[in-house]
């Protein structure tokens, strides 16, 4: 007697031994095939049940806001291997196929940028699907768990207005320029190959010959291949921005909803808590820009303040 080797395969049919069949012996003998079919089914159902248990645990962790996320390059290593071990080509293919099975808010893809470890977390899945003046397709927006370890002033001069080139403050600020040149150029080539521009309806604040203290309108803009979220995308409401114009289109990213867990970010991967910039500018003032404090509060700092950080944020779709 020996043991049957089980495989997690669903057998559509279970062999029926007929009168006159030669029974024989060994793993491929007729006498053993029926048991083999049933054993395979049992192993298949066990694998499915184990996966369901794990998914339920993850769901409850998410409901309790204690889900830390999983490394997708480990969780889906076998799938990624079929894309020449390129996780970015793999996630792009998943998005194109609208196959989000096993992908959860907070899960991440790790990579190196300028010699620094970055964990790009899933912040939202199809958060802006079909929105905007130009219809947005299927996408995933990623926001790094912690900030890039080099601080960047939001502006080189202490002003939060747009200018004659573009009335939207974000579009002409120093932070947008730095992250879309220096930072972007430090990204791995396979990641750059998959990033697309994020388009958004963002506030405008500019009048020739004047310095404005409130935003007076909004306009559609391609806000960059790298960007930072708005106040509304982090907090789900306006705290310091101009009422109306600063958050007309924003949806709160699920990763920030109902918890401060992911609003609080460190200086580099796992580093000390830090303050970090948002896209929105302050209402009622010509120098402040909205931010997140190192304790997670909705905050603001002078646009030229030099020791505020930013996460690495991008869209694949």
Pin down the residues of each PLM region.
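Extracellular "spike/adhesin" assembly and maturation modules
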Residues: 1-50
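Short, Lys/Arg-enriched charge-dense amphipathic segments
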Residues: 23-24, 53-54, 84
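Compositionally biased non-globular segments, especially hydrophobic aliphatic-rich helices
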Residues: 52-55, 203
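Collagenous Gly-X-Y triple-helix signature in extracellular proteins
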Residues: 61-317
């Amino acid at each position: 007697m020996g043991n049957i080797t089980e495989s997690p395969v669903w057998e559509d049919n279970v062999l029926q031994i007929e009168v006159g069949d030669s029974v024989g012996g060994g793993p491929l003998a007729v006498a053993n095939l029926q048991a083999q079919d049933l054993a395979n089914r049992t192993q298949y159902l066990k694998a499915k049940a184990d996966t369901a248990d794990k998914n339920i645990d993850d769901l409850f962790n998410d409901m309790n806001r204690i889900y830390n996320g999983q490394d997708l390059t480990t969780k889906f290593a076998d799938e990624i291997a079929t894309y020449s071990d390129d996780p970015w080509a793999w996630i792009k293919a998943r998005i194109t196929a609208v196959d989000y099975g096993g992908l959860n808010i907070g899960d991440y893809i790790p990579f190196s940028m300028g010699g620094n470890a970055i964990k790009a977390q899933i912040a939202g899945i199809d958060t802006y699907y079909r929105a905007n003046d130009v219809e947005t397709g299927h996408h995933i927006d990623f926001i790094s768990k912690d900030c890039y370890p080099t601080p960047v002033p939001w502006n080189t001069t202490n002003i939060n207005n747009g200018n004659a080139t573009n009335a939207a403050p974000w579009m002409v600020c120093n932070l947008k320029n730095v992250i879309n040149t220096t930072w972007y150029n430090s990204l791995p080539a396979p990641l750059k190959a998959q990033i697309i521009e994020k388009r958004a309806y963002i506030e405008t604040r500019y009048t020739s010959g004047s310095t404005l203290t409130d935003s007076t309108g909004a306009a559609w803009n391609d806000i960059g291949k790298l960007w930072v979220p708005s106040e509304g995308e982090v907090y789900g409401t306006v705290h310091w921005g101009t009422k109306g114009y600063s958050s007309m289109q924003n949806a709160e990213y699920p990763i920030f909803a109902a918890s401060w867990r992911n609003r609080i970010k460190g200086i580099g991967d796992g580093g000390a808590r830090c303050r970090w910039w948002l896209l929105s500018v302050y209402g009622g003032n010509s120098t402040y820009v909205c931010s997140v404090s190192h304790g997670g509060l909705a905050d603001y700092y002078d646009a030229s303040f030099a020791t505020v950080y930013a996460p690495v944020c991008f869209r694949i779709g």
